[in-house]
């Protein structure tokens, strides 16, 4: 039987240094050679059956028919890769070479030489790989977090229209209109602990849901179901095939409150189902999200990628890696960097890299912080904008920041053992685990941003991109003199598709108020928590709804737009709620 396409394609990486390379991720239903062939490549030129990664050769067109050879179209663009196997699933990350800068090239996917993408009678525009001009003139980045898979079209959606679906539908209707150059997905791409009714029915065919972990996922196969449910949504499938993406996990990609504290970890490790859950969560994240974050050069040097491809079944190799990552988080780095011309993006792991000893709590372990500092400070003057992608906001509403620092002080024993027990219970119930709950890390990040933003070679902006909190806002910090010359902003955008309780809306609004600030200060004094070295103010929001933010960065200019998905008598659309220039003052 011929190989079929089970999931994907996802266009994950496009090279902004030369404009010649890309990677495309797929899952097939059996072992095969997966090939990306740009339109116009002669049959058989792109793949070597049974071989490793190879560049295709042949005459290719740009968004045209096979004989389209208009000027500027890439010649010889394509590539292939043999699938690797994990837990009975078959994946490939296909390197595409030979692209031309400043081009838009339609592509198809073949498995063992048979075309499987796009499907027959596919209603959406061609999947294309768009490459930047070299040097790049600018970049448009759309970002958000927290996407619960939309229900099938025939079902009512109680949490409103999906912002990613709505963006995809708009792009499909206007293929030559505005589109992001990259999607930055800041965590909770799937919800392992909050499964849909349809997934729960499927889980019930596999095991008894009255036994732990109940209606949550339990193993690798069940994690793959979440990605299928999320990424097989037809219009989102098309979107991910044509817009590159960077991803980082948050807790729900594995389990709610993941790594919130040392006592939480100890309790989870005592549960008989936990080891399979955490290893499967890390394995599925590596396959579906992390691998595509890496450049072709990084992939070539990655020992885990080499190990899983060196054997007919890479499950044991990847499982061993996941076990090491769980036992010794400092031995693994999930954080990664992408450069988009003169914009540098650093995606920061704020879940697995934590130090949980109450007396030495840190959001990032020493090695992770050294990596972050090194990447942020490398080659001063070589970038105009620094984007720090962290699933958890650095700057929260001030009252909530103070409550989290108060809670952290209680948990480390500042008010005695009884208050420490109260603090731990509250930490878990209220999700008090953002940067504010790691005071030394909060200050260290503030210090790094100030260092980056000072001096004659400082970038125009440093933007901290975050999600998690199911609303959106813009906040701006202020340091004691001297202030950095760079404009620094916290840009929080969440959810893409989820809900927030009315009580939480009230709480977040209160957190920004003067009364809220006074309440927070009182709590911090009770916990004997120190005051932060910076202050900050909200300059936009809060906005509640399913939404995406888009940054347009061109030269040293930066513009921000917030779009919400809304439904009215005319249908579902993206409504712009806020639009501002970030480099001409507040």
Regions found by a protein language model. Give the residues of each.
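Metal-dependent phosphoester/phosphodiester hydrolase catalytic core
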Residues: 1-64, 68-586
């Amino acid at each position: 039987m011929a190989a079929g396409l089970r999931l994907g394609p996802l266009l994950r990486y496009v090279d902004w240094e030369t404009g010649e390379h890309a990677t495309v991720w797929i899952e097939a239903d059996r072992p095969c050679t997966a090939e990306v062939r740009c339109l116009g490549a002669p049959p058989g030129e792109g793949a070597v059956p049974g071989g490793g990664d190879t560049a295709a050769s042949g005459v290719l067109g740009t968004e045209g028919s096979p004989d389209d050879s208009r000027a500027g179209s890439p010649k010889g663009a394509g590539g292939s890769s043999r699938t690797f196997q994990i837990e009975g699933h078959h994946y490939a990350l296909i390197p595409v070479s030979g692209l031309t800068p400043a081009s838009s090239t339609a592509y198809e996917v073949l498995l063992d030489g048979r075309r499987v993408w796009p499907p027959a009678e596919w209603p959406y525009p061609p999947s294309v790989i768009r490459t930047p001009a070299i040097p790049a003139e600018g970049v448009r980045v759309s970002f958000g977090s927290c996407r619960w898979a939309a229900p099938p079209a025939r079902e009512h959606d109680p949490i409103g229209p999906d912002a990613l679906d709505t963006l995809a539908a708009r792009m499909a209707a206007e293929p030559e209109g505005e589109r992001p150059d990259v999607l930055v997905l800041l965590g909770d791409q799937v919800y392992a602990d909050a499964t849909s009714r349809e997934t729960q029915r499927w889980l019930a065919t596999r095991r008894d849901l009255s036994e732990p972990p109940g209606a949550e996922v339990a193993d690798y196969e069940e994690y793959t179901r979440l990605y299928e449910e999320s990424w097989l949504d037809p219009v989102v499938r098309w979107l991910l095939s044509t817009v590159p993406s960077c991803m980082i996990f948050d807790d729900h990609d594995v389990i709610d409150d993941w790594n919130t504290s040392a006592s939480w970890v100890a309790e989870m490790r005592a549960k008989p189902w936990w080891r399979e859950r955490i290893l499967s969560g890390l394995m599925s994240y590596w396959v579906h999200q992390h691998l595509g974050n890496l450049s072709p050069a990084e992939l070539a040097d990655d020992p885990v990628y080499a190990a899983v491809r060196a054997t007919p079944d890479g499950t044991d190799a990847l499982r061993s890696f996941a076990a090491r990552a769980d036992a010794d988080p400092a031995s693994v780095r999930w954080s990664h960097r992408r450069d988009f011309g003169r914009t540098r993006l650093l995606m920061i792991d704020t879940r697995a890299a934590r130090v949980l000893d109450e007396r030495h709590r840190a959001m990032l372990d020493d090695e992770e912080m050294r990596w972050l500092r090194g990447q942020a400070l490398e080659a001063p003057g070589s970038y105009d904008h620094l984007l720090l992608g962290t699933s958890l906001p650095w700057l929260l509403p001030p009252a909530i920041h103070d409550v989290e620092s108060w809670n952290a002080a209680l948990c480390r024993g500042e008010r005695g053992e009884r208050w420490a027990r109260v603090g731990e219970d509250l930490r878990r119930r209220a999700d008090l685990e953002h940067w504010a709950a790691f005071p030394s890390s909060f200050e260290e990040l503030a210090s790094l941003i100030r260092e980056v933003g000072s001096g004659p070679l400082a970038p125009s902006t440093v933007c901290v991109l975050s999600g998690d909190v199911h609303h959106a806002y813009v906040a701006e910090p202020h340091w004691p003199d001297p202030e950095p010359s760079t404009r620094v902003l916290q840009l929080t955008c969440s959810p893409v598709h989820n809900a927030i309780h009315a009580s939480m809306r009230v709480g977040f609004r209160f957190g920004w108020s003067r009364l809220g600030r006074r309440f927070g200060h009182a709590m911090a004094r009770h916990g004997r928590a120190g005051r932060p070295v910076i202050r900050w103010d909200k300059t936009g929001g809060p906005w509640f709804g399913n939404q995406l933010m888009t940054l347009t960065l061109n030269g040293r200019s930066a513009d921000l737009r917030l779009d919400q998905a809304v439904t009215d008598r005319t249908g579902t659309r993206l409504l712009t709620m806020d639009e501002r220039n970030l480099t001409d003052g507040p």
